[in-house]
């Protein structure tokens, strides 16, 4: 059985998430560097949860309406204040 068949359906690889949202892997890595996304890491692979998918959706919507990444971070913090406690 391949790793992709054993992986729970709720986790997406960087390639799968890129295809779903029509973004580049570099974009996702940049959002991770900026602290906007925090994918699970298994060895050298990033795995994105449903939560990461929802956060990316909010990030992209914010960018479409002209928000800066700092403004988007504030929106994400309001959307999930538990993240602030972990930081």
Label the model's feature ranges:
Residues 1-19, 38-42, 50-87:
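Arg/Lys-rich, alpha-helical DNA-contact motif
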Residues 31, 48:
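Conserved active-site tyrosine of GNAT-family acetyltransferases
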Residues 35:
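Glycine-centered, phosphate/nucleic-acid-interacting loop/turn motifs that mediate DNA/RNA or nucleotide
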Residues 45:
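Conserved catalytic core of two-component sensor histidine kinases, primarily the HATPase_c ATP-binding
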């Amino acid at each position: 059985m391949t790793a992709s068949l054993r992986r729970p359906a709720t986790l997406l690889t960087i390639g799968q998430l890129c295809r779903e949202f029509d973004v580049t892997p570099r974009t996702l890595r940049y959002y991770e560097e900026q602290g906007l996304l925090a994918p699970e890491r298994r060895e050298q692979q990033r795995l994105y949860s449903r939560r990461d998918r929802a956060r990316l959706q909010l990030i992209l919507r914010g960018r479409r309406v002209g928000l800066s990444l700092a403004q988007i971070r504030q929106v994400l913090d309001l959307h999930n204040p538990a993240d602030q406690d972990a930081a």
